[in-house]
Amino acid sequence: MKEFFRLSRKGFTGREDQDSAQIPDDLWVKCSSCRELIYKKQLNDNLKVCPKCGHHMRLSAHEWLGLLDVGSFREMDANLLPTDPLGFVTDEESYAAKLAKTQQRTGMADAVIAGIGAISNMQICVAVADFSFMGASMGSVYGEKMARSAERAAELGVPLLTINTSGGARQQEGVIGLMQMAKVTMALTRLADAGQPHIALLVDPCYGGVTASYPSVADIIIAEPGANIGFAGKRLIEQIMRQKLPAGFQTAEFMLEHGMIDMVVPRSEMRDTLARILRLYRQRSTSPAKAELAGRRATLPQPIM
């Protein structure tokens, strides 16, 4: 769906001579929020946002790559494959078997697609998580791709865009899954040292160790309207605290109101918003004031060792 974010907003038009036998089974989609039926083509033309209530439905990683300029994306680290370091087995199936089934169903090696692309002719590194792959749980490959993306952005001197959704750390990989939180965060310090920004986009749902680590230390944190963002889930918190939580708790709007994120941006405005942010950073990096400051630093006396 390279043209996903550039589709026309035309409504659905049907042929009057179609009989019921020719109507495909997946012609309609029911909105999980307002429960209204929507023509699938109309929904896709509207970037999978319900035209009746504005509910933002989930996108795949490949669909999110439609934010980039057409033909600009080049995938990196596609050869990284998850392993089963613990030989994890439950009564139902092994982790290795579950991985194989998920890979066959999704056509993905793991939950993250990473690479180099451009938005409005401005080069960036990008890493996108896909919730359809084991809930985008963060395992060794997820963390490695995110860390390499940060290091690649630092090496190339370009911004990093991460699009984040997750249910948390991948339990089947134990402490190896948990350590990805620290690994990715440390890689981002090298990006900061290179003077390049990390823009994190949080989409529904984003929970657990992912929320608690690298997206939360981004330079700019953006969320989609209505996205659920948190560490533990709302129901779990209510069970532990034995009291009801405030209305809208853990939604993007709640997080914005309490200063946890910077912006809530509708999907239809996302590409233009990212382009505007990238232009601001580009102007900052090429400003005369910054060049003068860099020159002053270069002439500072070196410390005596």
Curated annotation (Swiss-Prot):
Gene source species: Chloroflexus aurantiacus (strain ATCC 29366 / DSM 635 / J-10-fl)
Subunit note: Acetyl-CoA carboxylase is a heterohexamer composed of biotin carboxyl carrier protein (AccB), biotin carboxylase (AccC) and two subunits each of ACCase subunit alpha (AccA) and ACCase subunit beta (AccD).
Cofactor: Zn(2+)
ZnF region ranges: C4-type: 31-53
Gene (UniProt): accD
Amino acids binding Zn(2+): C31, C34, C50, C53
GO process terms (BP): malonyl-CoA biosynthetic process; mycolic acid biosynthetic process
Record carries keyword Nucleotide-binding: yes
Residue ranges occupied by any CoA carboxyltransferase N-terminal domain in the UniProt entry: 27-296
Cofactor note: Binds 1 zinc ion per subunit.
Protein name: Acetyl-coenzyme A carboxylase carboxyl transferase subunit beta
The keyword rRNA processing belongs to this UniProt entry's keyword annotation: no
Enzyme Commission number: 2.1.3.15
Role summary: Component of the acetyl coenzyme A carboxylase (ACC) complex. Biotin carboxylase (BC) catalyzes the carboxylation of biotin on its carrier protein (BCCP) and then the CO(2) group is transferred by the transcarboxylase to acetyl-CoA to form malonyl-CoA.
Pathway: Lipid metabolism; malonyl-CoA biosynthesis; malonyl-CoA from acetyl-CoA: step 1/1
InterPro entries in the cross-refs: AcCoA_carboxyl_beta, Acetyl_CoA_COase_Trfase_b_su, ClpP/crotonase-like_dom_sf, COA_CT_N, Znf-ACC
UniProt-listed PROSITE patterns: COA_CT_NTER
An annotated GO cellular component: acetyl-CoA carboxylase complex
